[in-house]
Amino acid sequence: MNNYNKAPSQNTESTGWESVAAMADEFKGEKEKRIEIGNLSPEDNFEQVAEALFLVDQYIFPDLFGDEEGAKKYSKELFSDDPEALFSFDKTLVAKDENGDIAGILVYRGDKCTPWDTNSIREKYLAIGNDLPERFERANENYLKKITGPELPKDAVEIEFLGVRDGYRGRGIGSSLMQSLINNPAVSEVHLDVLDSHPGARKLYDKFGFLPEGDKFPNYPDGTEGVQHMVYKNPHYVDKKNEEVE
């Protein structure tokens, strides 16, 4: 996860979505109900997906969508069948409750990521009748294009967006989404960034076995806060290509 898409506002009561930091307290909540983890599909409730995307990040999605109504109208167009795209159905995990409602979402990218195409996104946006938000170009060029740029090690992934809806906190949902990803034997490493202002998130990542890598760098856009890159190396990783050769 790059330094432009760090965290939602920490005022979770006003956003309806917790910051990633709040996940450290998830196991203290109400009695667990049935939650299933799987990939996002075109049949899912994209108004709930839009709520997730619009509120999980305080920089990117208000710039991209303009407002929450824009997010509800447009979010489905953002997702792609291309398994190597950012916002791929293949690389978006959702947690659903017993009614099929989306409780949480985790968006990640792989080691090979299709370059972000601002023109394609612009055309899709205009085709469904939305005016371009004032900072649409900034969201695409300064945020999303840069997220898809850095290369990752073979079979590694990077978590870009993670959130749990209000009403589902305290049930370990964020942790379950994370566990589902790091337990995947096809994933060699999981990368993410954590803000200094989120010690709870850092504690959670430490618990999962993430280790800091490299020096801290400034947070976008004001540079007043440190960001630490962290990596989890999957001990259960199986390199299928090497397995086939043997």
Predicted regions and their residues:
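Conserved GNAT-fold acetyl-CoA-binding loop/helix
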Residues: 58-79, 115, 126-130
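A short beta-loop-alpha structural element at the N-terminal edge
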Residues: 34-51, 59-64, 110-111
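C-terminal "cap" of GNAT-fold acetyltransferases
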Residues: 188-202, 208, 214-246
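Active-site rim helix/loop that mediates acceptor-substrate recognition in acyltransferases
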Residues: 69-92, 97-98, 146-148
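Conserved acyl-donor/pantetheine-binding loop and adjacent beta-alpha core of acyl/acetyltransferases
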Residues: 112-157
